[in-house]
Amino acid sequence: MTTSSNQQVVLAARPDGDLKPTDLRLEDVAVPTPEDGEVLLETIYLSIDPYMRWWMRAEKSYNDPIEINQVIVGATVSRVRQSRHGDWQVGDWVLAFSGWKHFAISNGSDLRRLDPDVAPPSTALGVLGMTGFTAYAGLRNIGKPKPGETVVVAAASGAVGSMVGQIARLRGARAVGITTGAQKLSYLTDELHFDAVADYNAPDFAEQLAKACPDGIDVYFENVGGKIWDAVLPLLNTYARIPVCGVISQYEKPSGAQENIDRLSNTMTQIMGKSLTLRGFIQTEYAEEQLADFLQEAGQWIADGKLRYREHMTQGLHTAPQALIDLLKGRHFGKTIVQVGEP
């Protein structure tokens, strides 16, 4: 490897409201050199995920916030370009957490080996990665759908939502997807075989959702929040389960903003009155015990043509800021990925 150019994207300013391209900065830095026990990784594919915007806030959540001038965090599919580590060879494909940079150093402890003959490497960021496992773990551990029950998911044409609906159907449940726009609605019913859909931007959204769920909602996979939650709440059945993996509608609210302050008290009343189970989760809490099960089961579903996925891929690290902005605005289907290097 002879290149001496290494690009990275850092947080230039803390966003207040909608993320702007000027909140991020593309920099040129030197390619690092591995020491004994280390490898040099080249990022081939970079995962773009909603949580990245949440970590740009000043407030700590389940992780420390990204600091000003710090490289944006993110999962990557990378290749070993130089190795001074006995377990890793030049050319190996790995899943890493290198962040928004072209080249990175690793001591190998945070790497997972990938086999490109088993599945396209980019799938380790989506359908066979964090997003797919988020859907799997949330349903397996919290949602626990039973045959014949109704499972509703918002942002249903996105990376997580599209997996939630398909896995629910594979478990014998009805899948109802919430999204907006004719193309996304038809994608859910025609390609992913959701049982019903509702358009959250339609004036009669609440009526559409009620019609799609004539027997109520048994599982609501929450990843959006806001007005969608307001429409879902009255339809929840007694003992319904609500896995919460995100509230993307709130990620770009200005710091300290409060909206519909009485929403929490109404939610708490419903939780008590209907004996609801509502639990937030981060997929990593289940990974050690269940990731292998997921990879085996999901891999078989894909091989059998039972689990479908889409990837929206842009080219070049410089496209990552706009890719995240577009993701937060719901402009694309499926999993958003940036191709940074050449395989």
Locations of regions flagged by a protein language model:
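C-terminal hydrophobic helical "lid"/dimerization subdomain
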Residues: 2-4, 285-343
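Glycine-rich beta-strand-centered segment in the early N-terminal region that forms part
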Residues: 30-48, 56-100
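NAD(P)H dinucleotide-binding glycine-rich loop of Rossmann-like/cofactor-binding domains
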Residues: 72-78, 89-155, 197
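Short glycine-centered segments of the SAM/dcSAM-binding site in methyltransferase folds
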Residues: 93, 150, 174, 240-241, ...
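Mid-domain Rossmann-like dinucleotide-binding core that forms the NAD(H)/NADP(H) cofactor-binding site
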Residues: 125-203
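Short amphipathic alpha-helix with an adjacent loop that forms part of the alpha/beta core around
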Residues: 204-215
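Glycine-rich phosphate-binding loop and adjacent beta-alpha segment
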Residues: 227-306, 340-343
